[in-house]
Design a protein with these regions (language model features):
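Sec-dependent bacterial lipoprotein signal peptides
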Residues: 1-9
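Extracytoplasmic cell-surface/polysaccharide-interacting catalytic and binding patches
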Residues: 11-212
């Protein structure tokens, strides 16, 4: 369905939220953002994004889904580390890509702490300015990498994976491992970020519904 895909996304035109400005009991309604069957639209019109203190989440069909985007930040103290289930599935995905002949490295970029993201973002701002940096880098507290559920795939050449056939493989097969390609071409307005063929987000069983 489009429900979680839209909930996970962020509109670049809105100002980022702050954890201080939202109470721990606040719930926000997110309207359905994509088309589907009438029955789907009737049952999936809205999702409640709930402040859990250090992060925001939405209840999916199967499990709680941590939400991290330009609307919903995480506390600087939120430090879950790399999710072991997500990592295990990522390694399976990488192995499958390698077996299919893609030059994918065993190395990847996974969990990043608030402090690490602060350094990265500031480096990008110093290099390109804040407006440009905001197109391709999350501000500290707003990066999916801080959830421990996001991973950037790297090729054997050391570069992020952008090759067209590899990107298509991910679109076709990532959901088999519980992942979605988060930042798609043509969805920059919705996500607030440039397309990233290499960036995967683990959502478990929800992935196949999102990809459908």
């Amino acid at each position: 369905s489009g429900l979680l895909a839209f909930t996970l996304a962020a509109c670049s035109q809105e100002k980022p939220a702050t954890t201080e400005a939202k109470s721990s009991t606040e719930q926000k309604t997110v309207e359905e953002g994509t088309t589907g069957s009438k029955s789907q639209e009737a049952s999936q019109k809205k999702a409640e994004v709930v402040n859990k203190g250090d992060y925001y989440s939405v209840q999916g069909k199967y499990d709680e889904i941590v939400v991290a985007n330009k609307h919903y930040p995480m506390s600087k103290d939120y430090n879950p580390g790399e999710n072991p289930t997500a990592k295990a599935e990522l390694l399976k995905l990488i192995a499958a890509m390698q077996q299919a002949g893609f030059p994918i490295s065993d190395h990847y970029s996974g969990f990043r702490s608030y402090e690490t993201q602060t350094q990265l973002y500031q480096n990008y701002v110093n290099k390109d300015g804040k407006a440009e940096a905001d197109r391709y880098s999350a501000r500290p507290g707003y990066s999916e990498h801080q959830t421990g559920l996001a991973f950037d795939l790297i090729g054997t050449n050391g570069d992020l994976v952008t090759e067209e056939k590899a990107a298509q493989w991910l679109l076709d097969h990532a959901a088999d491992y519980g992942f979605v390609v988060r930042y798609l071409k043509g969805k920059e307005k919705e996500t607030g970020y440039m397309a990233e063929e290499w960036h995967l987000r683990y959502v478990g069983k929800e992935a196949k519904d999102i990809a459908a």
